[in-house]
Amino acid sequence: MSEWVAWHDGYAPGSALTRRLEAVQRMIRAALDALPQGPISVISMCAGDGRDLLGVLPGHPRHNDVRGLLVELDPDLAQRAREHAAGVSPSIEVVTGDASRTTPYTGFVPADIVLACGIFGNISDDDVHNTVANLSALCAPEATVIWTRGTFAPDLTPTIRAWFTEAGFAEVDFVAIPDTTVGVGANRLTTPPRSFEPDVRLFTFLPSEERPSRRGGR
């Protein structure tokens, strides 16, 4: 069992992971609700087993409007996501691939919603900044990016929020979940998106012992 499969198996009622999931899904619902009528495209980077998006779509009024691309490197998690997606919507594609580079998104962008959850706590501060600066290349105009990062010391979330502003995003929502070290944010693109280029490196996961998430939530 990989470390990422073990991490996903850590969800339990009332746990910090579950409360994070609830916050992410609330922001996904809000983003879907805010979009005009018509097709909706969603990208989930480092999608894991896909529960962030796949747990929202059933029963949501925009369910049939959504096409999704879930990118996950771990083959076991990608297969879990694929099996889950098959029972949710035929318009969800799961790719076993490297979400840290832009190549897997070729042919799918621009997206109306981009999920960058479980990433910022596992990469260097410089790579967080680089990712935020380049996320608009995956985005349609006025797209929403939903992201997570632990609020453990030293808390980088205020800086990340400022980086989103610098990158042309307005903050829609941010919550530091009480009694946890979990932060979840949503930002809407308010400036023209960057041009998409394939094979651009966004980030690199650090070795396990060097990851900021070792100090708390991801």
Annotated model-derived regions:
Residues 139-151:
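Conserved beta-strand signature within the Rossmann-like core of class I S-adenosyl-L-methionine
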Residues 173-218:
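SAM/dcSAM-binding transferase cores
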Residues 111-127:
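A short SAM/SAH-binding and catalytic strip from SAM-dependent methyltransferases
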